[in-house]
C-alpha cells in the first residue's frame, strides 16, 4: 500500500524534506518536530500492541489455570497489564494529536524545475499577444520581457490609457466603489448594466469552453465546516484570509477549489474513474487582510467576485501532464479573449504550502504598464488528498494510495474585466467587447453588442 509521499520522505530522508522546506523559506525545525513525534508515536503504538497481545494471552491462560494460586497470579498480571495498556493508550492519544498537528503543518515538496527563492525569483516562460504599450512604459515593458530573454512584439501608443478604476467609475460610469464602501467597507463594489452583462458573459464563456472539453460542471457549496476547510488548506496560516460565519462551524469559500477538493472527503476513488475533471462556478469571498493598501482602487483585489475554477483528481503518474493541460486551458481562454499575457513559473518561496509547482498567467495591463495575475494553476500532488482522506484504489491487486489533486482558474470575472477595460479602450473611452464574448451577450435584450460607451451619468 502506497502511503503519503511527505510522510514517507520524512521517515526515509528527513534531511531531504528539510531542504524542500528551506526552499519555501520556512523553518526546517518543523521537520524535526514532525520526525520526533512520528518516532515516538510508532514506539508507543508498538508498546500498546505488545501489551494488548500479552494481556489477551494472559486472559486465555486464566481459563486454563491448573490451581487457584496460578489463577490469582494470572488475574493480577492481567489487571496490571490492563492498567499499563490504559496508561500507554492515553500517552499514545496525546502524542497522536501532536503528531497529526505536526504532519498537517508540513508543506509539499518542491518540483525540481521550480526556481528557488522569494517572489523575485519567479521567471516568465512564455508570452502571447501584441501588447499596447504607452510610450512612457516602454522601459518598464522591456524590464518585464527583454530582461528575461524574450523579444515580444508590441505596439507603442502615444496616448495614455486610463486605469480600469477610472474607466469604470469616471468614463463609463458603470461602477461605484464609494457607495459600496459606505455600506460594506473597502474592496466592495456596485457594478451596473453593461459591466454586469460582461461579468455574466465571461462566466458563460468559460463554462462553455471547459464543458466542451469534457469537464463536469459543478455548483458547489459556498461554505465548508472547519474540519474540512482546515484540511483543504493550511487554515491556521490563512485564517486572516478566510471569512468565518460567527456562531457557526462554517467558513465562506475563497474559491470553488475548496469544495471541489472536498467532494470526495474521506472517500475512495478507483483508478478506472481517473482523471476526474471538474469545473466549478461560484462566488468567492476573501478578506485580503494581507493586501494592505495594494490595489485599493477599482475591482482588481476585492472581497467578493465570481470565478470559474478547473479541478482535477488524478492518478499520481498523470498529474504533471494534467498540470500542463490546466494552464493550457487557461491560455486558450485568454487567447480567445485576445488579451496579451505571459505565463510565469512561480518561485519556491511563493508557492504556498500545497503546490509542488505553480504557474500564473498574467495579463498585460496597459494603464499600469505591468503584467498582473489573472490565473493560478497548481499541482498539489497528494498533499490535499492525504489531509482529506481521499484514497486511490487500483483494481489490479487492490493496491491503495492517494490520488493527486490539481486546480487552476479558468476565469475570475472582476479581474478579467479590469484587463478588458485597459486593453480594449480607445482614446475616446469606448471599450470594445472581445469577440469571443459577444454571442453570450445576445441572450440579453439590453446587453451591449460590440462595445461599451462612455456615459454622462451613472444608471443608478
UniProtKB/Swiss-Prot annotation:
Enzyme Commission code: 6.1.1.11
GO molecular function: ATP binding; serine-tRNA ligase activity
This protein's GO CC annotations: cytoplasm
Principal subcellular localisation of the protein: cytoplasm
InterPro entries: aa-tRNA-synt_IIb, aa-tRNA-synth_II, aa-tRNA-synth_II/BPL/LPL, Ser-tRNA-ligase_type_1, Ser-tRNA-synth_1_N, SerRS_1_N_sf, SerRS_core, tRNA-bd_arm
Record-listed L-serine binding positions: 255-257, 309, 409
Pathway(s) per entry: Aminoacyl-tRNA biosynthesis; selenocysteinyl-tRNA(Sec) biosynthesis; L-seryl-tRNA(Sec) from L-serine and tRNA(Sec): step 1/1
Keywords: Aminoacyl-tRNA synthetase, ATP-binding, Cytoplasm, Ligase, Nucleotide-binding, Protein biosynthesis
SUPFAM superfamilies: Class II aaRS and biotin synthetases, tRNA-binding arm
Compartments (UniProt record): Cytoplasm
Enzymatic reactions: tRNA(Ser) + L-serine + ATP = L-seryl-tRNA(Ser) + AMP + diphosphate + H(+); tRNA(Sec) + L-serine + ATP = L-seryl-tRNA(Sec) + AMP + diphosphate + H(+)
Enzyme class, spelled out: ligase
Gene Ontology terms: biological process: selenocysteine biosynthetic process; seryl-tRNA aminoacylation
Record protein name field: Serine--tRNA ligase
Amino acid at each position: 500500500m502506497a502511503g503519503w509521499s511527505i510522510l514517507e520522505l520524512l521517515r526515509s530522508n528527513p534531511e531531504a524534506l528539510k531542504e524542500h522546506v528551506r526552499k519555501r523559506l520556512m523553518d526546517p525545525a518543523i521537520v524535526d518536530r514532525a520526525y520526533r513525534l512520528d518516532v515516538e508515536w510508532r514506539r508507543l503504538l508498538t508498546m500498546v500492541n505488545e501489551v494488548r497481545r500479552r494481556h489477551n494471552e494472559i486472559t486465555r491462560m486464566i481459563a486454563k489455570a491448573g490451581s487457584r494460586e496460578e489463577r490469582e497470579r494470572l488475574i493480577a498480571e492481567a489487571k496490571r497489564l490492563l492498567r499499563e495498556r490504559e496508561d500507554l493508550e492515553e500517552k499514545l492519544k496525546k502524542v497522536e494529536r501532536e503528531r497529526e498537528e505536526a504532519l498537517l503543518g508540513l508543506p509539499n515538496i518542491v518540483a525540481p524545475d521550480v526556481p528557488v527563492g522569494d517572489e523575485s525569483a519567479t521567471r516568465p516562460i512564455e508570452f502571447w499577444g501584441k501588447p499596447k504599450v504607452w510610450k512612457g512604459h516602454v522601459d518598464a515593458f522591456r524590464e518585464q520581457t527583454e530582461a528575461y530573454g524574450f523579444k515580444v512584439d508590441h505596439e507603442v501608443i502615444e496616448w495614455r490609457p486610463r486605469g480600469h478604476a477610472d474607466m469604470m467609475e469616471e468614463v463609463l460610469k458603470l461602477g461605484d466603489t464609494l457607495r459600496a464602501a459606505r455600506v460594506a467597507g473597502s474592496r466592495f463594489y456596485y457594478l451596473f448594466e453593461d459591466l454586469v452583462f460582461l461579468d455574466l458573459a465571461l462566466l458563460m464563456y468559460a463554462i462553455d469552453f471547459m464543458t466542451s472539453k469534457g469537464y463536469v460542471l459543478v455548483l458547489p457549496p459556498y461554505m465548508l465546516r472547519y474540519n474540512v476547510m482546515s484540511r483543504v488548506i493550511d487554515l491556521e496560516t490563512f485564517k486572516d484570509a478566510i471569512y468565518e460565519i460567527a456562531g457557526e462551524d462554517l467558513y465562506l469559500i475563497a474559491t470553488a477549489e475548496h469544495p471541489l477538493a472536498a467532494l470526495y472527503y474521506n472517500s475512495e476513488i478507483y483508478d478506472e474513474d481517473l482523471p476526474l475533471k471538474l469545473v466549478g462556478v461560484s462566488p468567492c469571498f476573501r478578506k485580503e487582510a494581507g493586501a494592505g493598501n495594494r490595489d485599493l482602487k477599482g475591482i482588481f483585489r476585492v472581497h467578493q467576485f465570481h470565478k470559474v475554477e478547473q479541478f482535477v483528481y488524478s492518478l499520481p503518474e498523470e498529474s504533471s501532464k494534467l498540470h500542463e493541460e490546466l494552464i493550457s486551458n487557461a491560455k486558450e481562454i485568454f487567447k480567445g479573449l485576445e488579451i496579451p499575457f505571459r505565463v510565469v513559473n512561480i518561485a519556491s518561496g511563493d508557492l504556498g504550502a500545497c503546490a509542488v509547482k505553480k504557474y500564473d498567467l498574467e495579463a498585460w495591463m496597459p494603464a499600469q504598464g505591468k503584467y498582473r495575475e489573472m490565473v493560478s494553476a497548481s499541482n498539489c500532488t497528494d498533499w490535499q488528498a492525504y489531509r482529506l482522506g481521499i484514497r486511490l484504489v487500483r483494481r489490479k491487486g487492490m493496491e491503495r494510495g492517494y490520488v493527486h489533486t490539481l486546480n487552476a482558474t479558468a476565469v475570475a470575472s472582476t479581474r478579467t474585466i479590469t484587463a478588458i477595460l485597459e486593453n480594449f479602450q480607445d482614446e475616446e473611452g469606448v471599450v470594445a467587447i472581445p469577440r469571443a464574448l459577444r454571442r453570450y451577450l445576445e441572450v440579453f435584450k439590453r446587453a451591449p453588442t460590440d462595445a461599451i460607451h462612455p456615459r454622462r451619468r451613472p444608471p443608478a
